[in-house]
Amino acid sequence: MGKAQPLPILITGGGRRIGLALAWHFINQKQPVIVSYRTHYPAIDGLIKAGAQCIQADFSTNDGVMAFADEVLKSPHGLRAILHNASAWMAEKPGAPLADVLACMMQIHVNTPYLLNHALERLLRGHGHAASDIIHFTDYVVERGSDKHIAYAASKAALDNMTRSFARKLAPEVKVNSIAPSLILFNEHDDAEYRQQALNKSLMKTAPGEKEVIDLVDYLLTSCFVTGRSFPLDGGRHLR
């Protein structure tokens, strides 16, 4: 009998930056990948050519979330993991309706993973003890709060709390953990002054790049014991 085909890993927000790096990491390991994307960046075409299943999704409404879930539920054998990487960033700015800012942040960071975890639960179960994973990507600000991004920080804190609740609900078949990154990589338009200020906020004074995230994700996927925990990736920033 031949070796069973690996189950796919679902990555939300896989069209760019960390999500894209994770997708390519798994593809290079011959691991099937399902990627959600909102905007069709050129990188999506590369993923499709490499064999990834890429599904355009609108997580700004619950109907959009459930439509995406319905597509994923067509997977006949199940899922190896769900990596909740999709994110948005909004600040409380003059002229921006505060209720809209809060609703947007809660929709993408709370409603979306909450609904997907429930809708896709049966795809994660039935594969054995600690055989499946959910990883939530939260943020360093969960620990400290943010006076400029209050709604964002609150929504990521809610996601952090859901990590422990889903860990209780889904154990021992499914492990549920979160990763709380600070500065991982810069945007192309970030100028030298901003970059230096950002680097000085941590003890390690570097932007480690996607590999630091990939290594931690690999650890969590291979562990058969760790669940219900949040793992900071902040370079010692909490000690500054």
UniProtKB/Swiss-Prot annotation:
Q: Does the keyword NADP apply?
A: yes
**Does the record bear Zinc-finger in its keywords?**
no
Q: What is its EC number?
A: 1.5.1.50, 1.5.1.3
Query: What PROSITE patterns does this protein's entry cite?
Result: ADH_SHORT (PS00061)
Keyword terms of this UniProt record: NADP, One-carbon metabolism, Oxidoreductase
Task: Extract one GO BP annotation from the record.
Answer: one-carbon metabolic process
Annotated signal sequence range:
none
The molecular function terms in GO held by this entry are: dihydrofolate reductase activity
Instruction: State the superkingdom.
Output: Bacteria
Q: Which sites are catalytic?
A: 152 (proton acceptor)
Enzyme class, first EC level, given as a word: oxidoreductase
Family matches, as InterPro entries: NAD(P)-bd_dom_sf, Sc_DH/Rdtase_CS, SDR_fam
SUPFAM superfamilies attached here? NAD(P)-binding Rossmann-fold domains
CDD domains according to UniProt = PR_SDR_c
Catalytically driven reaction(s): (6S)-5,6,7,8-tetrahydrofolate + NADP(+) = 7,8-dihydrofolate + NADPH + H(+); 7,8-dihydromonapterin + NADPH + H(+) = 5,6,7,8-tetrahydromonapterin + NADP(+)
What is the annotated role of this protein in its UniProt record? Answer: Catalyzes the reduction of dihydromonapterin to tetrahydromonapterin. Also has lower activity with dihydrofolate.
Q: What's the family?
A: Belongs to the short-chain dehydrogenases/reductases (SDR) family. FolM subfamily.
Name of the protein? Dihydromonapterin reductase
Instruction: Record the organism.
Output: Shigella sonnei (strain Ss046)
What is the organism lineage in this UniProt record? Answer: Bacteria, Pseudomonadati, Pseudomonadota, Gammaproteobacteria, Enterobacterales
